[in-house]
Regions:
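Active-site glycine-rich loop that binds ribose-phosphate moieties when present
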Residues: 181-193
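Transition-metal
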Residues: 1-181
């Protein structure tokens, strides 16, 4: 992506109004591709194989497509717009995040705007060759204890996009070599510490 046709934050208002009027309140968003350095692309996102590592091999392969996102991907070495959805109108682009900041409740509704003062959610296609590492996302209450927001998440694998299972559907939960059964029992006993 080049910056030539990207509208700066302070110039979004005028083009946003025109885009919303032309789309009867709907905005056209461009694809948002996100690589993961620790996973391998499953090749079902309909990207050309030459584009799977568009950000470079060190960044990892593109295995996620995000929709309606105002959230930057939490990837090391990311490009400035990674994870952000762009609105496309008359050959120009601006971030959905800037659009939401500009239009507020007019764009996302009063209830969401008043509660979050931003667009707090997004959807994604998730496409890996094999299982993702075992991990967890904290709920809102637990995340707040460490100054973060919760991340409620669920997965749906539509058959239309999953006609090939690749190396799925399982995950691994591993322990360091040498971990004994008693080590695990001791850790579980200290769960609430």
């Amino acid at each position: 992506m080049t910056t030539e046709n990207i509208v700066s934050t302070d110039n979004v208002a005028a083009i946003l109004d025109r885009a919303m009027e032309a789309g009867d309140g709907l905005l056209r968003l461009t694809p948002t591709w996100v690589p993961r350095s620790f996973l391998h692309p499953g090749r079902r996102l309909k990207l050309h194989t030459d584009d799977l590592y568009a950000y470079g091999a060190e960044r990892g392969g593109i295995d996620e497509r995000w929709f309606g996102s105002t959230t930057e991907a939490a990837n090391e070495g990311r490009v400035w717009h990674e994870g952000l959805s762009f609105v496309s109108f008359e050959g120009e682009l601006f971030t959905l995040r800037d659009a939401v900041a500009e239009a507020g409740a007019r764009l996302i509704g009063t209830a969401i705007w008043e509660k979050y003062n931003r667009w707090p959610i997004y959807s994604k296609f998730f496409d890996n060759m094999g299982p993702i590492p075992h991990h967890m996302h904290q709920g809102f209450e637990d995340a707040a204890l460490v100054g973060q927001e919760g991340k409620p998440e669920s997965y749906y694998f539509p058959p239309q996009y999953n006609n090939v299972d690749n190396n799925f559907c399982y995950t691994f939960m591993g322990l360091e070599p040498g971990t004994s059964k008693q080590d695990v029992i001791d850790c579980l006993a200290r769960w609430d510490d």
